[in-house]
Amino acid sequence: MIGIDIVSIGRISRLKERHGELFLRRFLSEDELALAKSDASIAGLWAAKEAASKALGVGIGAECSFFDIIIEKSPKNAPILKFSPKIYENFNIKEATLSISHDAGFAIAVAIVS
């Protein structure tokens, strides 16, 4: 399945300004916080998790939380999509790929899960 999400970097900036680190901790793990170096990268992580949940066909909710979706970086700085053991088992995931981009005030992510 394929999931896509786009988010305004300005929207993420406003949420971060209003709620500070509480906003970030709502959807990012400690390791992911280290990847959140700019508002654009934070927006990319948000879009990535939303896209991954859509690729599962459920969205963010009871079946799949933000913390069931894990975003890492390869040595070449490419995004790596992983899931919690529960998600791998419940959705029988064999492979997952992710692309994130940001330009013109938006971040977009595409996730493919099979």
Curated annotation (Swiss-Prot):
<comment type="function">
    <text>Transfers the 4'-phosphopantetheine moiety from coenzyme A to a Ser of acyl-carrier-protein.</text>
</comment>
<dbReference type="InterPro" id="IPR004568">
    <property type="entry name" value="Ppantetheine-prot_Trfase_dom"/>
</dbReference>
<dbReference type="GO" id="GO:0005737">
    <property type="term" value="C:cytoplasm"/>
</dbReference>
<keyword id="KW-0443">Lipid metabolism</keyword>
<dbReference type="GO" id="GO:0006633">
    <property type="term" value="P:fatty acid biosynthetic process"/>
</dbReference>
<dbReference type="InterPro" id="IPR037143">
    <property type="entry name" value="4-PPantetheinyl_Trfase_dom_sf"/>
</dbReference>
<keyword id="KW-0808">Transferase</keyword>
<keyword id="KW-0479">Metal-binding</keyword>
<comment type="similarity">
    <text>Belongs to the P-Pant transferase superfamily. AcpS family.</text>
</comment>
<keyword id="KW-0275">Fatty acid biosynthesis</keyword>
<dbReference type="Pfam" id="PF01648">
    <property type="entry name" value="ACPS"/>
</dbReference>
<keyword id="KW-0276">Fatty acid metabolism</keyword>
<feature type="binding site">
    <location>
        <position position="50"/>
    </location>
    <ligand>
        <name>Mg(2+)</name>
    </ligand>
</feature>
<feature type="binding site">
    <location>
        <position position="5"/>
    </location>
    <ligand>
        <name>Mg(2+)</name>
    </ligand>
</feature>
<keyword id="KW-0444">Lipid biosynthesis</keyword>
<protein>
    <recommendedName>
        <fullName>Holo-[acyl-carrier-protein] synthase</fullName>
        <ecNumber>2.7.8.7</ecNumber>
    </recommendedName>
</protein>
<dbReference type="InterPro" id="IPR008278">
    <property type="entry name" value="4-PPantetheinyl_Trfase_dom"/>
</dbReference>
<keyword id="KW-0963">Cytoplasm</keyword>
<keyword id="KW-0460">Magnesium</keyword>
<dbReference type="InterPro" id="IPR002582">
    <property type="entry name" value="ACPS"/>
</dbReference>
<dbReference type="GO" id="GO:0008897">
    <property type="term" value="F:holo-[acyl-carrier-protein] synthase activity"/>
</dbReference>
<dbReference type="GO" id="GO:0000287">
    <property type="term" value="F:magnesium ion binding"/>
</dbReference>
